[in-house]
């Protein structure tokens, strides 16, 4: 009897584990685009309605980054997004350290590499170009 109960418990646990690992296709695509020499750390799903263009990016989150570590930030858009996902990284003094949007050329990069020179909490600010509506994901990876 114990054997049957253990088998049922094991099967139920296995089913829960398999269902929990169902990945978002957009996240999977973005992780694969980060490159073979990277290790996935975290993803941020961003979904925003159309806003008014301003200097401030609308989706803000924080992440702890470590000194002497190279990070890759990859941005991917869903097919129905009207704008392209943009990322700006700020340090603890609110100074912009790096951005995927080059204001001079107007170019938006699909990924940016960042070598952290100081451990600490960094603010990650996301938005879509021209404050358009969109859905996307930002993936943080460590470059080996």
Task: Specify the residue positions occupied by each region the protein language model found.
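Short, surface-exposed beta-strand/strand-loop-strand elements in extracellular ectodomains
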Residues: 80-96
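Non-catalytic extracellular/lumenal accessory regions of secreted precursors
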Residues: 21-59
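Noncatalytic modules at the cell exterior or secretory-pathway interfaces
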Residues: 114-132
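Extracellular and analogous surface-interaction loops
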Residues: 59-69, 113-119, 144
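Edge beta-strands of jelly-roll/beta-sandwich modules across compartments, strongly enriched
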Residues: 130-143
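Hydrophobic beta-strand segments within beta-rich accessory/binding domains
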Residues: 60-78, 123-127
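Bacterial Sec-dependent N-terminal signal peptides
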Residues: 1-25
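Extended, low-complexity, turn-rich repeat/linker tracts enriched in Gly/Pro/Ser/Thr and Asp/Glu
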Residues: 77-85, 130-133
């Amino acid at each position: 009897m114990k054997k049957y109960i253990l088998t049922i418990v094991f099967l139920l646990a296995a089913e829960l584990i398999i269902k929990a690992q169902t990945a978002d296709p957009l996240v999977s695509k973005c992780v694969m685009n980060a490159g073979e020499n990277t290790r996935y750390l975290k993803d941020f799903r961003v979904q925003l309605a159309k806003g008014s263009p301003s200097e401030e990016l609308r989706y803000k989150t924080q992440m702890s980054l470590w000194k002497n570590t190279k990070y890759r930030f990859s941005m991917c858009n869903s097919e129905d997004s009207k704008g392209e996902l943009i990322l700006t990284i700020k340090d603890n003094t609110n100074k912009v350290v790096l951005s995927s949007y080059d204001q001079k050329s107007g170019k938006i990069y699909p990924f940016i590499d960042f070598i952290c020179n100081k451990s600490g909490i960094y603010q990650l600010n996301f938005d879509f170009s021209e404050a358009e509506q969109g859905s996307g994901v930002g993936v943080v990876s460590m470059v080996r």
